[in-house]
Design a protein with these regions (language model features):
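Donor nucleotide-sugar binding/catalytic pocket of nucleotide-sugar-dependent glycosyltransferases
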Residues: 126-161
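Short His-centered aromatic/hydrophobic patch
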Residues: 65, 86-92, 110
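N-terminal strand-loop element at the rim of the active site
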Residues: 5-66, 207
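A conserved, positively charged/aromatic
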Residues: 100, 104-134, 142-143
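A conserved mid-protein helix/loop that constitutes part of the nucleotide-sugar donor-binding site
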Residues: 16-21, 170-193, 208-214
Length: 336
């Protein structure tokens, strides 16, 4: 099959990670894959077998989107691409428009609980809609076409395992985009109440809230305890040499970071949100998002006793199964 993947950018995030891993594996299985995005820091992680083309598919401008559609349509006609897989809302509009011009099918993967507004209008016109969790599917249920399913995202198996000798070192780690929805501000406030305890926090990620979070850590006198590393391609290695992952998100479509912690074996203190609860199997050691007092208590309990969630790997979707499921959707659409 000749498959086009469209996403806004290849900067830091779970959508980007998913598209990169899926595209790389599809080419290993003999398919031709073209990724269209505005580029970004993670672009170099695409396999040499994956074709990448830059277009401003991240811009929420109807004229720009139409021009992108015209360009993609010309590539489809000249090069024989067979199917479009869109990720995020602007790419969905572009895919719908392009499909109308070229008569090739398109599908959409919903990665998060987006606002229920005009941005989701194209979904009713998709050949298939994939949601990354039951939570996301339930959220967009009124926007779905006839054909839809849940395919949880997954990561290739990690090459590292957690070194349990780090449990007692109280070396916490946060991995994720620095936006309000990720909840790092709650953790920083909680840690501010524990600044006399023996701990450190490594923050891996970048985003619009970085400067504000750094300032707040400084105001609370935590600059010597919290290190903001920015984006790092060594997340797995650093997680394997940490004591515990802190995952304070307010909402997640799936939650690749705690899933990765499960693969590595790293203990987790996480928010009590539906996607995490399903992974963990119970709400023991889960904390309400935004609850500073609750996070303070959970972190102090870990420092004192080492207690945290150890995510069962059996609850984590396998990467091979995820790719198989996507491949099956592609095949079914092309055979119709």
């Amino acid at each position: 099959m000749r498959i086009i993947q469209i996403l806004p950018e290849l900067d830091i995030g779970g959508v980007e990670r998913h598209v990169i891993d899926l595209s790389n594996e599809l080419t290993e299985r003999g398919h031709d894959v073209m990724v269209i995005s505005n580029g970004g820091q993670m672009q170099n992680q695409l396999s040499g077998k994956v074709l990448h083309r830059d277009l401003p598919v991240h811009k929420k401008n109807p004229i720009t989107a139409w021009r992108c559609s015209v360009k993609i349509s010309s590539w489809i006609r000249q090069e024989g691409w067979e199917l479009i897989h869109a990720h995020s809302r602007v790419p969905a509009w572009i895919a719908w428009c392009t499909s109308s011009k070229t008569k090739i099918p398109w599908i959409y993967t919903a990665h998060a609980c987006y606002s229920l507004n005009y941005g989701l209008i194209p979904l009713k016109h998709a050949g298939f809609v994939i949601s990354v969790s039951e939570t996301v599917q339930d959220h967009i249920k009124d926007c779905l076409p006839v054909n839809f399913t849940v395919i949880p995202v997954a990561l290739p198996e990690s090459t590292v395992r957690w070194d349990s000798t780090y449990r007692s070192k109280n070396r916490f780690i946060f991995v994720g985009r620095l936006t309000k929805i990720k909840g790092l501000d709650t953790v920083i406030e909680a840690l501010g109440k524990l600044k006399n305890e023996n701990w450190t926090l490594d923050v891996l990620g970048d985003g619009p809230e970085k400067e504000e979070l750094e300032k707040r850590a400084d105001v609370l006198g935590l600059s010597d305890k919290i290190t903001f590393h920015g984006y790092s391609e060594e997340a797995d290695s650093l997680m394997s040499r940490s004591s515990c992952l802190l995952f304070p998100s307010h909402c997640e479509g799936y939650g690749l970071v705690p899933a990765r912690a499960a693969q590595i074996g790293l203990p987790v203190i996480a928010s009590n949100i539906p996607t995490v609860l399903k992974m963990a199997g119970s709400n023991k050691y889960l904390v309400d998002p935004g609850d500073v007092q609750g996070w303070q208590s959970a972190i102090f309990d870990f420092i004192s006793t080492g207690r945290a969630v150890e995510m069962p790997v059996l609850n984590i979707h396998s990467f091979e199964r995820m790719v198989d499921s996507n491949e099956s959707v592609y095949t079914d659409l092309l055979c119709d």
